[in-house]
Amino acid sequence: MFTGLVEDLGKVKNLTLSSKGAKLSVETKLEDVKLGDSVSVNGACLTVVDIKSSTLTFDVSPETLKRTNLGKLKTGDYVNLERALRVGERLGGHIVQGHVDFTAPVKSFNFLGEHYELVIEIPEEWSIYVVEKGSIALDGISLTVNYVKENKVFINIIPHTYKSTNLQFKKVGDLLNVETDILGKYVINYLNKLKKKEDIFKEFLKW
């Protein structure tokens, strides 16, 4: 589990794609990382399989490549890194699982004087999970939804977040990894199951 508070901007050293997935090597300043540790890389939970000096290497599964922007990384690109939350630590952002739901393109990204306004477009079927003033994780960053208009999500980015994450390198058309709020998923899942039970009960009464 993660908090969505980026600890370091890692620099991609190498990405090797194969039929079995990929190996991703990232140079980082993160300390106290061991083999087998979970690290959020652009919001995707990956396992450290090799450590050489300041470089961490991860295995990336085909499913993760399919759901995220990791397969599009190039040498020199920057990725958001966060170590897994430890028991007793403060939850400064929101609960982020590291399970990316989908990627969304940047539709606009503008500086409005005191903050940046980021607009992404999400698939219609996922819009039910994104609500005004709710939490959302973009490339592993815990952010608050300003408002939603149709399938477009508007998010305000403060300068500190912009400068300390890979958002400073993003432009229109780039894909961001999106993880919707886990609490919303549980609520929707519960309501869907409740509705199915009600439908079954109504059918039973017809007999």
UniProtKB/Swiss-Prot annotation:
Catalytic activity: 2 6,7-dimethyl-8-(1-D-ribityl)lumazine + H(+) = 5-amino-6-(D-ribitylamino)uracil + riboflavin
Record's function text: Catalyzes the dismutation of two molecules of 6,7-dimethyl-8-ribityllumazine, resulting in the formation of riboflavin and 5-amino-6-(D-ribitylamino)uracil.
Tagged with keyword Transferase: yes
Residues reported in the UniProt entry to bind 2,4-dihydroxypteridine 2: 45-47, 59-64, 98-100, 133
Chain positions recorded as 2,4-dihydroxypteridine 1 binding sites: 4-6, 142-144, 156-161
GO MF terms, alphabetically ordered: riboflavin synthase activity
E.C. number: 2.5.1.9
Keyword Repeat appears in the UniProt entry: yes
One Pfam family in the UniProt entry: Lum_binding
This protein's encoding gene: ribE
Protein name, as recorded: Riboflavin synthase
Pathway: Cofactor biosynthesis; riboflavin biosynthesis; riboflavin from 2-hydroxy-3-oxobutyl phosphate and 5-amino-6-(D-ribitylamino)uracil: step 2/2
Keywords annotated in UniProt: Repeat, Riboflavin biosynthesis, Transferase
Assembly, per entry: Homotrimer.
Domain of life: Bacteria
SUPFAM superfamilies hit by this protein: Riboflavin synthase domain-like
